[in-house]
């Protein structure tokens, strides 16, 4: 049970940092291209530690994102649940891809997230986003290898430290 507790702490810390990163102010032209850090973190943990990142957590943290960003209540929750569901559904295939192929799969997941976002905007009568709206999945794909390696390295260090303590 101890390794799960350590992974869960890392998961909560990573989600909190992802939510805070998304709140950082950027120029308008750059803010539209910013990848959804929460989506990247949830995707990583759904791939590597599905016991801590399930649909319930995706819904809960999606609601937190809705509250923090002041958007439509339930919008991010729906998007994160669908993202995590698709990740969990194809998890056994995606885990064995090299990181660059995983980045392509993450691009497809983030593109699906953008399509859902566009659909929600259309249903709510919001304005149509500019074309740079579609660059965010590309940026997410480019950032994915570093996110993956960073979080994987932290998980590995945590496991090694726990093994040394138990020995």
Where do the PLM segments sit?
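Terminal, non-globular segments
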Residues: 1-167
């Amino acid at each position: 049970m101890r390794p799960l507790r350590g992974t869960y702490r890392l998961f909560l810390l990573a989600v909190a940092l992802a939510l805070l990163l998304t709140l950082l102010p950027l120029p308008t032209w750059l803010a539209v291209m910013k990848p959804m850090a929460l989506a990247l973190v949830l995707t990583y943990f759904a791939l590597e530690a599905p016991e801590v990142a399930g649909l319930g957590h995706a819904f809960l943290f999606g609601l937190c994102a809705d509250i923090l960003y002041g958007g439509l209540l339930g919008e991010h929750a729906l998007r994160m649940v669908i993202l995590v569901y698709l990740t969990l559904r194809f998890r056994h295939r995606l885990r064995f891809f090299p990181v660059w192929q995983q980045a392509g799969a993450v691009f497809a997941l983030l593109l699906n997230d953008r399509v859902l976002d566009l659909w929600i905007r259309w249903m709510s009568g919001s304005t149509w986003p500019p074309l740079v709206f579609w660059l965010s999945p590309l940026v997410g794909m480019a950032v994915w290898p570093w996110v993956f390696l960073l979080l994987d390295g932290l998980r590995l260090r945590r496991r090694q430290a726990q093994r040394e303590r138990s020995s």
